[in-house]
Each structure stands twice: as C-alpha cells, then as structure tokens.
C-alpha cells in the first residue's frame, strides 16, 4: 500500500497491522520523521520516504492500492497528478481519494490558522481573495500560513471537479461516498460518521456545502 502525502502515517497503520507492506511518501521531512517514530511506537514496520513521488521511478507498477487522503485539494494540476499516478499502479490496482469539498464550512483548511477567530470561522475561505487575505492579516496570521491558505483557495477541489478530472484522465469511479460527518471526526471530536443524505448528494454544488469529506475509489478504464 502506497500513501502519497502520508503525513504522520496514521492512515497506513491499519494496513501495517494487517500485515501489508506499507510505503509513505511526503515532501515534508518533518512529517516523515514523525511517521517513522509513530510506527516505532506502534511496533509496526513501514517505509517512509521524504520525496516527490514522481521522482521515485523504481516504485512504478508496484502498488495494488494507492491512498490520496486530504492531498488532491492541495494539487494545482490535478489532471497531470492523477494521470502520472497510473505509472505506480499494479495491474487491476485502485486509488482511494478523500478530500473536503471546497464549499463546506471549513473546506479552506482555515482551522490551521493561529487565530481562534479565523480557525473557528466557517465559510470565510469563500470570500474574494483580496478580502480573505486582508482579514487574515488583520488577525496577524503568519505570512507562511496566509500563503498556504491562499494556495488552497487556488487549488481547491469540488465534487464536480473531481468527477470531471477522473473522467478526463482515463479513470472510472468504482465507488463514491459523501459524508455529512467525516469519519475522521470520530477520533478528533468523538462524532459518529454520518453519510450525506442521498437526496442532497444528487444536487450539484449544494452537496459541496454539506460534504465534510468525499471518498472515492477509482481505477483506470
């Protein structure tokens, strides 16, 4: 199992516990070190590499499962990204993608802000860029945080965008599940996962507002 943008390695742990060979890739060296230490504390084996995945040619055609969790919304050229990932799938391999819909209350990842006001303010990321940037500076956010939030605003991902990109890059959707309450909220906030109402899930654009996480399983056509 390969995870691109593995962070601290939490998503790979269940697979390691099942006996799978796991490899985590992240461009942040600090995250890779955290992942290594995390697996050591859990007494599990895993390989973690600080690199751009597309520089690791020796991993091509190797993985039956690739995880892309909370990463696609940070990628500017999503078409090139998904197309290039085909090189790393083994025959009949699949890719799991999860992301917060852009128009949901915290789809801009503003919870990373230092200011308690900004980090708890829903929908602020939907403001025009210049106004959003101005408010972030008024609340004395660090310039690095401001730039990260503005980059996410530029590279945002919606349900409609993901579906279109999947089709354009030669994949098909095997399974789609939209969540009103993100399954990860159970660990973070003690909230039980809750799927989005089917009627709302079929309303374009409106469904983005209520989808705190969107799960997709895709494979090449």
Where are these regions (language model features)?
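S-adenosyl-L-methionine-dependent methyltransferase catalytic module, highlighting the catalytic core
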Residues: 79-84, 94-216
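Conserved SAM-binding loop
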Residues: 1-107, 215-220
């Amino acid at each position: 199992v390969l995870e691109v943008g593995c962070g601290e390695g939490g998503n790979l742990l269940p697979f390691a516990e099942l006996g799978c060979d796991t490899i985590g890739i992240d461009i942040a060296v600090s995250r890779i070190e955290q992942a290594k230490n995390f697996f050591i504390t859990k007494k599990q084996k895993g390989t973690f590499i600080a690199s751009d995945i597309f520089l690791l040619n020796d991993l091509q055609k190797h993985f039956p499962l690739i995880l892309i969790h909370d990463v696609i919304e940070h990628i500017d050229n999503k078409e090139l990204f998904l197309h290039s990932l085909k090189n790393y799938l083994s025959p009949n391999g699949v890719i799991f993608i999860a992301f917060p819909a852009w128009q949901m209350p915290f789809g801009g990842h503003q919870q990373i802000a230092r200011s308690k006001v900004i980090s708890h303010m829903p929908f602020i990321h939907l403001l025009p860029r210049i106004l959003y940037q101005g408010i972030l500076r008024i609340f004395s956010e660090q310039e690095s945080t401001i730039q990260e939030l503005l980059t996410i605003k530029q590279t945002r991902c919606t349900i409609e965008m993901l579906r279109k990109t999947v089709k354009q890059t030669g994949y098909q959707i095997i399974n789609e599940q939209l969540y009103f309450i993100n399954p990860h909220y159970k660990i973070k906030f003690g909230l039980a996962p809750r799927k989005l109402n089917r009627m709302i899930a079929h309303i374009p654009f409106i469904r983005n507002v209520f989808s705190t996480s969107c799960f997709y399983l895709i494979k090449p056509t």
